[in-house]
Amino acid sequence: MLYGAIEAGGTKFVCAIGDEEMTIKERVSFPTTTPEETMPLVIDFFKQYQADLAGIGIGSFGPIDIHRDSATYGYITSTPKLAWQNFDFISTMKKEFPIPISWTTDVNAAAYGEYVFGSGKGLSSVVYYTIGTGVGGGALQEGRFIEGFSHPEMGHMLVVPHPKDDFAGSCPFHGNCLEGMAAGPAIENRLGKKGQEVAEDDPYWEIEASYIAQCAYNTTLMFSPDVIIFGGGVMKQRHMLQNVHDAFAKLVNGYVETPELSKYIVTPALEDNAGTLGCLALAREAVLHS
């Protein structure tokens, strides 16, 4: 028995096959161009394994419709990627693969991967953020995603501008939300160079850490999770995690007694495999509950 994973990202689709032990057997990627160009490549990849394919887990860029009783369940909805607006992802896959399919956001899939296999393994409540080209967040409680009328958009929480930061924010909707102030494009728009080109001792990192710490602070007060995981390219800066710990401690100011910060605010144990493994695990769950 095999399981399929689709990480549908804004720049590329990552497709993988895993076995019953959740070992990745093959993984490929395709550019995210248009449904007409990208989806045939995705379908052809899984066709090779169709005889043994039991279920597929999809984690997609969004916004997406997650309500099973909705007429547009399984759609990518109001995405800024015009070619993908109102694309019926689930039906497109179901036509070729009439098997159980799990459907969630790309960041939820990564959160689930960390919950099952990574930094959240064995814990009851996990919140995961990715800080890269954009900022997204997903939360789990006892293995269930925390969501209501839609999936959370945690990356767009408002943050208080740092006193040394006069940048107005790059989010076209909210300006100084977390994504607008801390995502990769915000760094580049502010400094004129990409985050990986900024020196480790540049004073800017104090500003960046303050926004990520505000995110952790807000998350702590709202959910008090067992762990907060920060992934994405920005968090690959070697010094960033300690900077966030320091800024977070100042914000909390002793008001909440959190777990030890080295175990409470962490980076992904699965690194770049979180999304793929999360999709595989969600595919397995879809089969078990079908």
Where are these regions (language model features)?
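Conserved A3 ("GATE") glycine/threonine-rich loop of ANL adenylate-forming enzymes
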Residues: 12, 109, 133-136
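Glycine-rich phosphate-binding loop of actin/hexokinase-like ATP-binding domains
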Residues: 121-177
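Short loop/edge segments at beta-strand edges and connector loops
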Residues: 103-107
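Residue-level structural signal for beta-strand termini and adjacent loop
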Residues: 29-30, 82, 150-151
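Short alpha-helix plus adjacent loop in nuclease-associated cores
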Residues: 92, 110-111
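ATP-binding/phosphotransfer module of carbohydrate and carboxylate kinases, centering on a glycine-rich
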Residues: 1-56, 64-72, 91-101, 116-125, ...
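Conserved NAD(P)H cofactor-binding loop of Rossmann-fold oxidoreductase domains
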Residues: 61
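A charged helix-plus-loop insertion that forms the helical arch/lid used to bind
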Residues: 70-85
